[in-house]
């Protein structure tokens, strides 16, 4: 049955307009993006097929061009559209942290860092540099590869913080495995950076580990 033959309240577009995007399933959201299905499949049916083939929404969104286009119903045009949508979402979150408002919500920071780091295929260590009113001065990705006390140089983090005249820092890195549980090495690294930044009176407010689901906050865990 074509989507146009569905009850109005069950059609993805009408459902979104009536109840908001949060009321839609992953398949329904993807169907709106796809716009059309293929012979014998509605856009929602195609969306369900693709989600099953990729293993969920996140792997689909993070697929490279070759893997994305390997599926019937997808091609370079859809890939570029999707990348544009994802980049707009990241920039929207970034702009929200650049409006000069003080950071008061860990959820706000977690959403931003998730958008920045979750899609990365390798470990990245980043810093949010803040002024004395906890407003974002700069976001920087400083190190890539295996993130541990041997590969992240406290002196360089201190230099970047001083260059931005930061009064505080929020640390972040991702676990490409998807498991956001802080490791012993993560905790040791955090202590080293706290000590180094403390020598120049710069506070480390938190350290987020980004994986699948909600990022883990060291501050909320009582690890700092």
Curated annotation (Swiss-Prot):
Q: What superkingdom heads the lineage?
A: Bacteria
User: Keywords in UniProt for this one?
Assistant: Hydrolase, Metal-binding, Metalloprotease, Protease, Zinc
Work out whether the entry's keyword set contains Hydrolase: yes
* Residue ranges occupied by any MPN domain in the UniProt entry: 102-224
> Which biological processes are named by the entry's GO terms?
proteolysis
- Give GO MF terms, alphabetically: metal ion binding; metallopeptidase activity
Checking InterPro entries in the record gives:
MPN (IPR037518), RadC_JAB (IPR025657), RuvA_2-like (IPR010994), UPF0758 (IPR001405), UPF0758_CS (IPR020891), UPF0758_N (IPR046778)
Listed Gene3D superfamilies: Cytidine Deaminase, domain 2 (3.40.140.10)
Checking SUPFAM superfamilies in the record gives: JAB1/MPN domain (SSF102712), RuvA domain 2-like (SSF47781)
Can you name this protein? UPF0758 protein Mlg_2664
Q: Give the originating organism.
A: Alkalilimnicola ehrlichii (strain ATCC BAA-1101 / DSM 17681 / MLHE-1)
